[in-house]
């Protein structure tokens, strides 16, 4: 990292709260422009508030654009299956590793994947031999191994939750100071105004804890 310098001419400054009053002064001081939300970073929409369904629209549009460039009707079901797992799922992989996608967005993405699998690029509806959630089951459970986006979303957020609980880094300490404080993570609840990332972690925690149990052991670390 030695020798790297910030190019302020290619940078933008984002101000929050009281700092917005002096935004122009800060921008002049650093010699860069002022940025405004929302922005897109590595394909991920970033905003100072929770994103609306309309702002998730670009995710659906990217998937549709990719599908429109394929000749699905010329592919076998096996060929479509490979494209769904290797391309379509990976297009949203980075995003679902950071945010809990809204149900409406997940259903729409599944609709596009299902339609491509059964119909190719044909607009004419074709009879589906089984439900999409059956197709998404592992092969040893009677499915075709298509990645279930909701399950994958939860698993990827679960990795961040595990790192939050087991590691001691900069981002972990920042989140703990802001949201956890002196409480145990099991006592922390989501509140309106919390970041989208934290909301996803809390939803994942709630899901995991509903399937888990606690062992008191000697009770030395148990809080009442």
Where are these regions (language model features)?
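A helix-boundary/hinge signal
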Residues: 1-224
